Amino acid sequence: MTDQIHRILTRVQKPARYVGGEYNQIVKRKQDIDVRVAFCFPDTYEIGMSNIGMRILYGVMNEMPGVWCERVFAPWGDMEAEMRAHRLPLWALESHDPVRDFDLVAFTLGYEMCYSNVLNMLELSGLPLLAKDRKGLEGIVFAGGVCTVNPEPLADFIDFFSIGEGEESTREIIECYRAAKRQGLSKQEFLREAAKLEGVYVPSLYTHTYNPDGTLAAITPAPGAPARVKKRIVQDLDRAYFPTKTIVPSTQIVHDRSNLEIFRGCIRGCRFCQAGFCYRPIRAKSADTLCRQAIESLEDSGNSEITLASLSTSDYRELEALADGLLRYCEPRKINLSLPSLRADNFSRELMLRIQKVRKSGLTFAPEAGTQRLRDAINKNVTEEEILSTCATAFSGGWNSVKLYFMLGLPTETDEDVIGIAELVYKILQVWRENGSGKKRGLSINLATAYFVHKPFTPFQWAAQITPEEYLRRVHLLQANLHAKCVDYRYHESDLSRLEAVMARGDRRVGKALLEAHNLGCRLDGWDEYFDYEKWLEAFRRAGLDPDFYTTRGYGVDELLPWQTIDVGVTTNFLLREREKALRSESTPDCRTHCNGCGARRLSERGLCDESPAV
């Protein structure tokens, strides 16, 4: 297929997306391979190659003898048109072989708005969309990633899901498949064997029935299938696989830098944050391990920037020691050290001043809510005083721009909370007037608000999403209270967030709407150029579904939820306790201060989170 691919490259944007051949890509001899995996990222090359999870699992699979994992990305619209016109099937970058020729087709799901791309990539590959129509042991389709904590909207299309962290479970899945292939098992026999692995959910082994009002009545597992599927976790991150010799992209990507994962989980327990609950228990790498991995990665890639990735980087216990070690290496080489996910309540001016010697990065904070009452309700344990003090520290240190992120539509939010966002912005402006250095340049405040989506496995999973009309009313209320010229305010469009809520909170029937949307041409929904909400509304009409059933309808606390087959560690009782505290605007201390009994400890072999207080 290589010659055919090259003939159409001159007709598309960014042809480097489609050819592979990058430094450090892995190519193996086909005669040495007995399991081939097409690792599919359901978005463009630039997005997928920035994904740290994809880089990790690409390395994990290719370390296995007899296994060759190759990368596949969603084509942009111009390339898709050329592929269809020339009847070219979707191919893998390393070999240029069609995806339909692979043993396993694996998708990583990090964003619900990529679901339409999954169907489009299957169709472009020449594979049947519905799992029940794929009969043989070849072309088994499975998926992992954080979105799989509610796998049901994709249950009709995916043969099985890998729930939780994949470094160890992916190896077990491939060995299970290799054995099935050697033994000549049927697809159904293989799926039953795979279902015995911890963390594997096979949707065809579960029957969903519904009440007359549309709510779930029962989820019935087939004989031998577990009633609940427990997510997999990596117990020791210091010993876990982490790639320091990674592919160097041959075109610009979104995050063109080295990424270093410093810990998983989060001590904070913000009630809106799905990742904070789903990645528990908290586990961290040592500073020595991180320094070694960082230096090896930078020396191999030649990158001029490295990011310390986590949900809350400033909560890493050894941050000062880690930063010291990295800066000793980075400063003389003019390598920028980026610290995202900093919190206003533990911002270190000294650390930031040292980091800015190479390049001053932007200052970003996410207060999420405009008043202390609402911040307490969502358990965003940061005070207005801490926010203003942090800004004063930063402004006096030379920063003259700040990005602020908030959400609209949080449970219990009132107009007072919305206006409170504007009031906080003006207080920050006043702090600048009192503390800013280099005032000739003026202060720049970039303010963004998102339309809140209530995700599974959070204390707000039962809540109703506000209507799009109410969301826009609150947006306009905030706009009416913002007058300073230094403030650039942007807000998320409501249609996309509404559809995201359906996909995040939906049951198995949503798959029918997803299939109708695919037939109507929906794809690349995360991109403004392609998102067409009217087509989606038509898809729901054809499927006989009302999006409001999954969005503006609150779920009953006694209601059977679509994702109840999945066990992420955090218990329903804990989430209900946190929900009640939210309604009282009562905060919960972080895990480092006090163990709040979320249930995630039981997933750890040691029975403890790394951040748990001594007991």
Q: Each predicted region: which residue ranges?
A:
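N-terminal [4Fe-4S]-dependent radical SAM core
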Residues: I8-A38, Y45-E46, P203, T209, ...
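N-terminal pre-triad scaffold of radical SAM enzymes
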Residues: V37-D43, M61, V248-Q274, L298, ...
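Conserved SAM/AdoMet-binding glycine-rich loop
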Residues: C40, M113, E296-K403, L408-N446, ...
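Short secondary-structure boundary/capping segments
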Residues: M54, H86, L122, D156-F161, ...
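Glycine-rich beta-alpha loop elements in corrinoid/cobalamin-binding modules
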Residues: A74-A222, P459-D507, L514-D528
